[in-house]
Amino acid sequence: MNIQALLSDKVSQALIAAGAPADCEAQVRQSAKAQFGDYQANGVMAVAKKLGMQPRQLAERVVELLDLTGIASKIEIAGPGFINIFLDRQWVAEKVEYALTAPKLGVAPVEPQTIVVDYSAPNVAKQMHVGHLRSTIIGDAAVRTLAFLGHNVIRANHVGDWGTQFGMLIAYLEKMQNENASDMGLSDLELFYQQAKKTYDEDEEFALRARAYVVKLQSGDEYCRQMWRKLVDITMAQNQVAYDRLNVTLTKDDVMGESLYNAMLPEIVADLKAKGLAVESEGATVVYLDEYKNKDGEPMGVIIQKKDGGYLYTTTDIACAKYRYETLGADRILYYIDSRQHQHLMQAWAIVRKAGYVPESVPLEHHMFGMMLGKDGKPFKTRSGGTVKLSDLLDEAVERAGKLIAEKNPDMPADELKQVINAVGIGAVKYADLSKSRTTDYIFDWDNMLALDGNTAPYMQYAYTRVVSVFRRAGVDENSLTLPLVITEDREAALATRLLQFEEIITTVAREGTPHVMCSYLYDLAGLFSSFYEHCQILNAESEEIRQSRLKLAMLTAKTLKQGLDTLGIQTVERM
């Protein structure tokens, strides 16, 4: 049930009937304060200006023509021409009843699209670190949200599995196998990479062999490809452990590494030349873009092939977009890559559009994000200044959550305690990130993220347990609630209306890739339930009808909190 869309349609019809152009915008929004109703239509002022009318006069005409029979109990004009809409409580109650039993909480089915989501993208032969966290969990929240709405979502893990460094890595893997030390060395990928680089820098014979292996690998040598595949498989097996711990939906089947596009690169360079988009410049192949100027004010040159014949990341990204449209059939392509890559992507996509590889009707969207910072405002590091491994971060999260949860639940069975600790610890790290606007940097703070109050995962998980505990104490389930829902109190109405806004919220998150909007909604919902719980008797209500009615509100609250947290990849628990 998308109330905002329903009211927008109704107000737009009234505006058009009042003389507004067909493309007018009703600008219906959720009201910030209860005194302004549940929704407010703000589009009258802009339309009145176009029509040369007084806004208040147009607002009065719109209200006369606005048919909200059975939907609104009252419509008021405020200020110069704001239209305040107060929803009818019986109508709200009926919609809550529907959401309680309907599939997906009553969220209307969408026309499904094929949507490719590019996220995570770790490098082969390197351990995942905190720098991979944001792309991985924000991208996965987008995937979960889009899938919930009914879209065909293709997860694309654009793994860094190609490049000149693989000659060095293959040579070092070979060296270790000859020394029967393969398993030991690859158990710590970071150490493996560092030792390979050290050997490359210090041993000229090793360096020559490494450079030879680069050429062999790129020409399809079977031995080199086997060694390369082993490196990829070992890396992705270790990454899968991290994905599973994070409750992220990526698997090995979602890997679409840089190597996937190798065969396309020569064809793309040739095609761009044939179309007159690429030219030779000092031995390299370059595309000049008028949209981007260099320091001299001239079109910026984007190299797609070096003079030694090598290709660049831009070339791969052009091929990647082409593949996702032509082969995967994408209707929309989302990239969860940090903000530092924005210009690079924009240049690649400019070439993609000019070449006609992806039509303008298929959006290419860079859902960029900022950095995770330490309390000092600098990039988050270890105390010694090193990169924080993702596995170490998650270990510490679980350890800290363990102290918090075990202290409050001394009698909880060990298996349940372990599950709760893991859900709270991992959830705290994820929610702290997801609850911030992805476009900004944020400060990583253990105390804040594990707090049991405020907009945190532990608070949200506790809020859920508080709701479900009502049903344990009542000894009822959904099927036993047979009496109709009635709304008589303001706090009931506020909670019920907010519950019905779930579809508006999840639609916004799907459109804009903004999981913090879902976090804010769930936090607000938990607060409204808390106020309702404290002021409206549930189990000891004055009548069985009111008791069941309030239990239904509690039931939909539990379902909405659980579903909302699930779209974020945050696990709920029954007790805390």
From Swiss-Prot:
UniProt protein name: Arginine--tRNA ligase
Gene Ontology terms, MF aspect: arginine-tRNA ligase activity; ATP binding
Organism field: Yersinia pseudotuberculosis serotype O:1b (strain IP 31758)
UniProt keyword Nucleus present: no
GO cellular component, as recorded: cytoplasm
Catalysis performed (reactions): tRNA(Arg) + L-arginine + ATP = L-arginyl-tRNA(Arg) + AMP + diphosphate
Taxonomic superkingdom: Bacteria
NCBIfam families: argS
Chief localization: cytoplasm
Keyword ATP-binding: yes
